[in-house]
Amino acid sequence: MNVLTYSSAKKQIIFMALYFVITGIVIRLIGYSLQGSLSAFTQAGIGDLLSGNFSVKDMFHFDFSFDMSQFDGFSLNMWGVFIKDKIHSVVNDMMPTTLGAINMLMLSKYLTLERAIKLGIKLY
């Protein structure tokens, strides 16, 4: 049976504080890694964003136009390459770095206050 003493409570508070400091540093690093995608907001203009004239196409600059002449004969290989290139361009526009994509997934899954407190207690 665990008994909560002054020294054990002090250790627990220190571990929780350490965890929150490390989490803050990780969140800041995630922000720096996603800075490329966030800079798209400044390209669209803060004025447009605040006035409500902001659209998704201004932020990502998707290009869905293509030349139909390359599909003469409806070659399956050409269609496959075309679709693969379009998917890559969309993913690269939305998530400029692989690290940024992984960090966003991890951030949404793990960084909640309840989990931080539980992990701080488990570290003790």
Swiss-Prot record:
Residues passing through the membrane, by range: 13-33
Keywords: Membrane, Plasmid, Transmembrane, Transmembrane helix
Compartment(s): Membrane
Source species, domain of life: Bacteria
Major subcellular location class: membrane
GO cellular component, one term: membrane
Membrane topology classification: Single-pass membrane protein
Name of the protein in question: Uncharacterized protein pXO2-27/BXB0026/GBAA_pXO2_0026
